[in-house]
Amino acid sequence: MAAWSNTRALGLSRVPRQTPRARLRLLSRAGEGAPVPLFLPLVLALAAGIEALDVAEFLRNPTKLAKGLQALHQALRADGITCGCGASLEMEALGAELDWKVYPPRVVAPPPALLSLDPANIAERVSRAARIVAAVDATRRLAATAPGEPALVVALTGPGSLSAQMARAIGSEPAIPLSPTAPLLEIAGRTVLEVARLFLLAGANVVILLERDRPAAEIAISETWASVVTPISNLARFHKALPIMLTTPDATPLPPAIVPCYPAAAIPEDGGRRPRALALGVDQLDWRLPKAEAAVLTTDGELPVDTDISALRVACQAVEAELDRMTATGK
């Protein structure tokens, strides 16, 4: 573990902070950041071990899901609880067949009649998807019962990345191009919008779009991408939630409502005042607080399901100790 500063070594006691949801309300105001960054690591399937369940079964059981996530949150003491996190969630909701021998599960067959789906079809499929139904139910329970007002986080596959998944899944058909197209982007965007809507109605406070396949600005479909992302960010803002996009800095400009999130190792020199999120790597737990200012600290994906919880707890405590130091010293 890195030699992090900690409150005891500095002669500091644990410093009271506003609740995570109160700090989120500050962030939701245009251009206003919270005094101390929110720490929101993406941890979901790891809680299956607490409930001694297979991951696939755990993610479909709302009672076990809510209980396991609350227990994991109490162990890690981060600022948020991850209620949903990618892992082909959206593809499965549309009807894709997944291989659950591994986690995250792999898509082995595309959703039926994918290219003929309209908004009503998409909304219906999403509303009946077992994993989404369980996660939304768990979100609703945690919103009502989790002590300390933790932020409730849902991390969804971004429209660009989801359309790329769709293209790969149907790429074995000769008539279908392997690269994402405008129609696929529109289907992907509507799918993410409908999934986000359900979580927001249940009480989610943060929507993170995992968007590694964001189209470059000069690509023709970049306008389509912007047109499907904007409603998602606007919906989050309508529900007083914070929309964040984990992506790379060198692609299509983001809608103004979205908080950009970049890997901590590749921070752009944008010089702007816009609140920014930074992502710590999940491939190792030797986390070091970035020198750049950030409104939110998260991770660049979901923590692996085989992560040692004790080691993760130590890593989270180190981050929280550094945030305590920042609170105490005003730095």
Name each model-derived stretch.
Residues 3-9, 99-198:
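Active-site-proximal, glycine-rich beta->alpha crossover segments in alpha/beta enzymes
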Residues 4-46, 136-148, 183:
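N-terminal amphipathic alpha-helix/helix-capping segment at the start of soluble metabolic enzymes
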Residues 6-11, 23, 50, 237-331:
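Catalytic-face loop-and-helix region of soluble metabolic enzyme cores
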Residues 21-24, 66-70, 136-143, 196, ...:
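Generic structural signal for well-ordered alpha-helices
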Residues 33-37, 77-80, 147-152, 203-205, ...:
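Short, well-ordered coil/turn segments that N-cap beta-strands
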Residues 67-86, 194-206:
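Catalytic domains of carbohydrate-active enzymes, especially glycoside hydrolases
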Residues 80-102, 119-128, 204-223, 301:
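Glycine-rich, proline-tolerant flexible connector loops at the mouths of alpha/beta enzymes
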Residues 192-247:
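Aromatic-anchored, glycine/proline-accented short structural segments
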